[in-house]
């Protein structure tokens, strides 16, 4: 598949996902009642179908989740002019948030109902600057290990031509979600 074909496929997938997200509840936080009976993969799949809210940060930073599977989450994004640093390349914080989102959601797909996680460590390597010429990038996060207390994952950020822009790893602390109070 050529770079143009990759980009066309990415754009078509993006339009399809955006249509589902726009038809759903929009950005926000799912209620405990909405997700209590769902495992992490089911939650992510429901979000992609527009049945659950998605994270508001995705709208703010112009990226979205485009694919989920067991132990995998793929995000796609396009930095806007307000995401550039003073020298005209994409700010490292944009990279970090996109990478952390793909990593966290990959880990989330392995959570059983009533279990949660938080990022304990995030290591990022920015290997090539993203300039305004880059139309889209994709972050594909994959779980390396998922245990009772810790999970680890890795992610690569690439362009449609396969150019590697960054890679990262995470260690997440896994825990039981607190019971909902009746107050």
Label the predicted regions.
Residues 1-183:
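Terminal targeting signals and extreme-terminal segments of soluble enzymes
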């Amino acid at each position: 598949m050529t770079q143009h074909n990759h980009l066309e496929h990415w754009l078509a997938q993006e339009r399809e996902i955006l249509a589902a997200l726009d038809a759903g509840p929009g950005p926000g936080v799912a209620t405990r009642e909405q997700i209590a009976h769902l495992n992490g993969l089911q939650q992510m799949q429901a979000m992609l179908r527009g049945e659950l809210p998605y994270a508001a940060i995705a709208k703010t930073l112009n990226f979205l989740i485009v694919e989920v599977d067991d132990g995998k989450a793929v995000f796609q994004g396009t930095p806007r002019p307000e995401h550039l640093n003073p020298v005209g390349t994409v700010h490292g914080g944009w990279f970090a948030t996109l990478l952390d989102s793909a990593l966290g959601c990959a880990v989330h797909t392995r959570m059983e109902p009533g279990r949660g996680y938080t990022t304990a460590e995030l290591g990022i390597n920015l290997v090539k600057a993203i300039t305004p010429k880059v139309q889209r990038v994709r972050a594909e996060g994959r779980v390396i290990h998922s245990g009772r207390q810790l999970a680890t994952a890795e992610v690569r950020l690439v362009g449609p031509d396969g150019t590697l822009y960054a890679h990262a790893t995470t260690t997440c602390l896994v825990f039981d979600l607190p019971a909902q109070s009746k107050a």
